[in-house]
Amino acid sequence: MQTLKTLFLLLTFSSIFSQENWVSLINNDNLNNWEIKQGSAKFVLENGVISATSILNTPSTYLGTKIKYDDFILEFEVYVDNGLNSGVQFRSSSNYNVPEHSRVYGYQFELDTNENRGWSGGIYDQSRKNFFLYPITRNERGRKAFKNGQWNRARIEAVGNSIKTWINGVQCTNLLDPLSKKGFIALQIHNIADESLVGKMVKWKNIRILTGNLTQYLSESENYATEINNLDNILSDNQLKNNWRFLWDGQTHDGWRGAKLTTFPKSGWIIENNILTVLASDGLESTNGGDIVTSEKFSNFELELDFKISKGANSGIKYFVDTNLNKGLGSSIGLEFQIIDDKNNPDANKKFKVLEYSNGNWNSHKDGIKKNRTVGSLYDLIEAENLNEQRSKRPVHPERWHRARIIVNNGHVEHWLDNIKVLEYNRFSQMFRALVEYSKYSKWENFGQLKSGHILLQDHGDKVSFKNIKIREL
C-alpha cells in the first residue's frame, strides 16, 4: 500500500513538474510578446485564440515571437480554412536587405489543406533554399495525419540538428539538418491571389514551448517516418543500422577510376573540402578528364548524392554501366539520371522532327521538343515529372545543392529529385524495350539489361560538383 502511495505521489509530482516547465506563448489579453515580421494581414487574439484573416495585395504575413529559441519542443493546435496554405516558422530570421515578400527566412512547419498532396507537417525552407527539406513523400501515414475542417494538434521537436514533427500524434518528419540553430517562431497567413479566398482564416490556440530538460520529453521516432539526412559527410546511426555506406570517402580517389582507364584521371577532376568536382572544358562528352566509375559493380541498390551545377551545365549519373562498350569517343554506356540546367542548356529543350515515308517521299509528320533530356529524366527515354504533386517538376537552380536518389530493385527503378519522385519504370518490361528501340541506345544490344554494372559520374565538359555520395545494397 505504501509503495502504491509513493508511486502515486511521484507520478503526481512528475506531472506537476512537467506542466510547470511548459511556457504558454499566448497571454490572456494581448500579443505583447509577438510582433509582425512581414506583411500586412491582421492577427487578432480573442478568448485564447490567435486568428489571421487572408487578404489580397500583401505578401505572406508573419506574426513572430520577440524571443529567439534554439532547442525546444513546441506544441500548438491549429485550424486552417479549406483552400488556404499556412505554416509555422521556427529557428527563423529576418533579412531587411531584400524585398518584403522574402524577408522572413528559415524552417517552416507546413500547413497544407490540399488533400491530394497532404504535406502538412513537412518542413519547407522558406525564402532560403525555397524548397521542401522534408516533403511528405515517403510517409503515407504522415501524409494523412492532418484533417481539414477541424482543429489539429501539432508538435515540433528541434534539438541540435534533429528536427521532428507530429500531427495528431502521427509522426510526419524525421530530419537531420544544420542550416539554422536559433531563431524566432512565427505564425503565417499565406499571401493569396484568388479572390474567393479573401476572408478565410487560420487560427491557433494552446501554443506552448518547452526549452529545458528536453531529453526526458523527447518522443520515440517511428520507423514509418523515413529519416532524411542533410548533414555533410556523416552517416547517421539510423543509416548505419540500415547498411548505408559512403561510395566516395570525400578525400581520396579510392573506389573510383576513369571509365576508360585503370586509374583515376590525372586531370579534369578535383577534390576540395569533401566535394568532388568535374571541371569545365569544352562542353563535350569525356574530352577532358573523362567519366569516372566505381570499382565495384551493383545490381539492387539505393543511391543518394548531392549535386551542384554551374549555369548551363550538363552531366549525369549512370548506372548498369559496361565500360567495355564504347571504347571510342564519347561517354560510357548505361542508364542515365540526367543532370542538366533545364533553363540554360539547349539539350534540355532539343527540337526534333518526325518524318513519314509515303508514296516515295519523306513528309514532315510532327515537330516537337525532346522532354526526356531534362534534369531527373532517364536520358533520352523517359521524361522526369512531378509524381507527388499536381504541379510541374520543381526546378533545379545553378550554384545550389540538390539531391538525386536512384532506387533499383529487381528491375523496378525510381528516380527522385530533392525527395520528390520524378519517374519509375521496369527495365525488363516490354515498354522499356520499345522506348530503347526508338532512342539513341537502339544500336546497343540488350541496353539496360545487365544483371550488374558500374555507377558513373559524367564529364560532359561543364563544371558540376558532387558530395555525400552514399549507397546501400538491397
Please name every model-derived segment:
Residues 19-474:
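Carbohydrate-interacting regions of secretory-pathway proteins
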Residues 1-20:
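Bacterial Sec-dependent N-terminal signal peptides
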